[in-house]
């Protein structure tokens, strides 16, 4: 089994967040930028060798963070991202092609998911590390789903068998590269890496995630993430003193 590399697509602007003078991955969360939390959660794992972060060409915020060299004693490499998530991930994979081994695997993670727990990452690597088509964290859909008809309910949708995809999403480096390249060549627009592998005749494995692994999309999510991180820190302190 090869090494694991973190890939963080972070070239987006995140306009839905509203307010502030910076993209949501650079907003402060408990005194630190959101992307800093995301990197630390991945690079703190002993099996993760380093990270590649894909940034906008004119990103004015990254250099001020001082993350270009190391996080948790591991290298952080920077590449220029693209207009879409898939373009940024492909750029990061191309960079890894020059420094990684053919059997290495990648953990593609949203820059705005700062609350990934060590237990989740362990579970993803343990259950999905050997999967030929990769694996992803996901949670079963719990709420009743409605399909809209204008501003009214058009139908109730069965949630049986439905899961909500999260990140990280874990794949063999070569498998994901081939899937993304093929999707691009065919003009298929994919919204996450698992969809590219699905389209490329694969079946990524679902690994149960946690509700706390939330994605920062709106201002209220920052407050919720702060509560999750505070609770995680308290739990760790209790374990250390037990």
From Swiss-Prot:
State the Pfam families in the record. Answer: IspD
GO BP of this protein: isopentenyl diphosphate biosynthetic process, methylerythritol 4-phosphate pathway
Per the UniProt entry, the disulfide pairs are none
Segments crossing the lipid bilayer: none
| SUPFAM superfamilies in alphabetical order | Nucleotide-diphospho-sugar transferases
Enumerate the residues marked as the site Positions MEP for the nucleophilic attack.
Answer: 159, 215
The family database entries (PROSITE patterns) matched by this protein are listed as: ISPD
> What PANTHER family does the record point to?
2-C-METHYL-D-ERYTHRITOL 4-PHOSPHATE CYTIDYLYLTRANSFERASE, CHLOROPLASTIC (PTHR32125:SF4)
InterPro entries named among the record's database cross-references: IspD, IspD/TarI, IspD/TarI_cytidylyltransf_bact, ISPD_synthase_CS, Nucleotide-diphossugar_trans
Q: Name one GO molecular function term.
A: 2-C-methyl-D-erythritol 4-phosphate cytidylyltransferase activity
Protein name as annotated: 2-C-methyl-D-erythritol 4-phosphate cytidylyltransferase
Q: Which reaction does it catalyse?
A: 2-C-methyl-D-erythritol 4-phosphate + CTP + H(+) = 4-CDP-2-C-methyl-D-erythritol + diphosphate
Q: What CDD domains would the database entry show?
A: CDP-ME_synthetase (cd02516)
Record HAMAP family: IspD (MF_00108)
**EC number(s)?**
2.7.7.60
Its pathway is: Isoprenoid biosynthesis; isopentenyl diphosphate biosynthesis via DXP pathway; isopentenyl diphosphate from 1-deoxy-D-xylulose 5-phosphate: step 2/6
Q: Where along the sequence does the record put site: Transition state stabilizer? A: 16, 24
- Which family does the record assign? Belongs to the IspD/TarI cytidylyltransferase family. IspD subfamily.
Describe the function of this protein: Catalyzes the formation of 4-diphosphocytidyl-2-C-methyl-D-erythritol from CTP and 2-C-methyl-D-erythritol 4-phosphate (MEP).
Keywords, sorted A to Z: Isoprene biosynthesis, Nucleotidyltransferase, Transferase
Protein species of origin: Halorhodospira halophila (strain DSM 244 / SL1) (Ectothiorhodospira halophila (strain DSM 244 / SL1))
